[in-house]
């Protein structure tokens, strides 16, 4: 039977947090951010396995969190790579052979909802690839190299991409392998498919599905958690 797998990318160092502790290990309400993220997927009935990607020297820390909070479905903890795309590729190589849909999610994005996860799987089965996100609330400007505004795109045409980003496993693995061969650099996994002419369906995420990257995000995260509990 085919599986739905999730790769949790926890290999970042979180330089913008101005902390010696990686952002995924910082705490909200006395629990590490990674705990909340793992719990969302481990308790979701449509997720069959979790592959956690982290820094090699943080594998034991992750293992301790998994054991302490009795988190199920984590099949492997694998070391990350030099760049995020390398870490994702390592995760892709670590999922089960019978994986059909793979979700790729930021460890520092702990407020993903069950509906976002379920819709990602559903749209991937329908279209082959899907990513959640939101329309920007603010007006976006395009500026030139001298710093002057030159255009104002329609907000309805813009989309702030979040995670999970969800894919047919064979499609995303094939595109990542081509990316390595051609030595291309990307900032997220939708770009991996775009590089090879593949379409990604964009569906509604949540403004609460934030990625915690700055000290201000930690404060906002506490407020979001209070509303959710």
Curated annotation (Swiss-Prot):
This is 2-C-methyl-D-erythritol 4-phosphate cytidylyltransferase. InterPro entries: IspD, IspD/TarI, IspD/TarI_cytidylyltransf_bact, ISPD_synthase_CS, Nucleotide-diphossugar_trans. It holds the Pfam family IspD. It comes from the Bacteria. GO terms for cellular component: cytosol. The record marks 155, 211 as: Positions MEP for the nucleophilic attack. Catalyzes the formation of 4-diphosphocytidyl-2-C-methyl-D-erythritol from CTP and 2-C-methyl-D-erythritol 4-phosphate (MEP). Its EC number is 2.7.7.60. Keywords: Isoprene biosynthesis, Nucleotidyltransferase, Transferase. It comes from Clostridium botulinum (strain Hall / ATCC 3502 / NCTC 13319 / Type A). It catalyses: 2-C-methyl-D-erythritol 4-phosphate + CTP + H(+) = 4-CDP-2-C-methyl-D-erythritol + diphosphate. Belongs to the IspD/TarI cytidylyltransferase family. IspD subfamily. Pathway: Isoprenoid biosynthesis; isopentenyl diphosphate biosynthesis via DXP pathway; isopentenyl diphosphate from 1-deoxy-D-xylulose 5-phosphate: step 2/6. GO terms for biological process: isopentenyl diphosphate biosynthetic process, methylerythritol 4-phosphate pathway. GO terms for molecular function: 2-C-methyl-D-erythritol 4-phosphate cytidylyltransferase activity; cytidylyltransferase activity. The record marks 16, 23 as: Transition state stabilizer. NCBIfam families: ispD (TIGR00453), PRK00155.1-3 (NF001183).
């Amino acid at each position: 039977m085919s599986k739905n797998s999730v790769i949790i990318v926890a290999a970042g160092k979180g330089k913008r947090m101005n902390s010696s502790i990686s952002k995924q290990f910082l705490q909200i309400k006395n629990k590490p951010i990674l705990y909340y993220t793992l719990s969302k997927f481990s308790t979701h009935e449509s997720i069959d396995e979790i592959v956690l990607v982290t820094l090699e020297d943080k594998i034991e820390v992750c293992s301790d969190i998994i054991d302490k909070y009795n988190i199920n479905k984590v099949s492997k903890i694998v070391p990350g790579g030099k760049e995020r795309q390398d870490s994702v590729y390592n995760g892709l190589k670590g999922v089960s052979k019978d994986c059909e849909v793979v979700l790729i999610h930021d460890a520092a994005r702990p407020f993903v909802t069950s509906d976002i996860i379920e819709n990602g799987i559903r749209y991937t089965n329908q279209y082959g690839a899907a990513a959640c996100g939101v329309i920007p609330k603010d007006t976006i400007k395009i500026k030139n190299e001298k710093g002057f505004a030159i255009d104002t795109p329609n907000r309805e045409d813009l989309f702030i991409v979040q995670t999970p980003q969800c894919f047919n496993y064979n499609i995303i693995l094939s595109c990542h392998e081509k990316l390595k061969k051609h030595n291309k650099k990307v900032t997220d996994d939708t770009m991996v498919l775009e590089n090879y002419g593949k379409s990604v369906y964009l569906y509604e995420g949540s403004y609460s599905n934030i990625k915690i990257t700055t000290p201000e995000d930690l404060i906002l995260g506490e407020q979001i958690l209070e509303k959710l509990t």
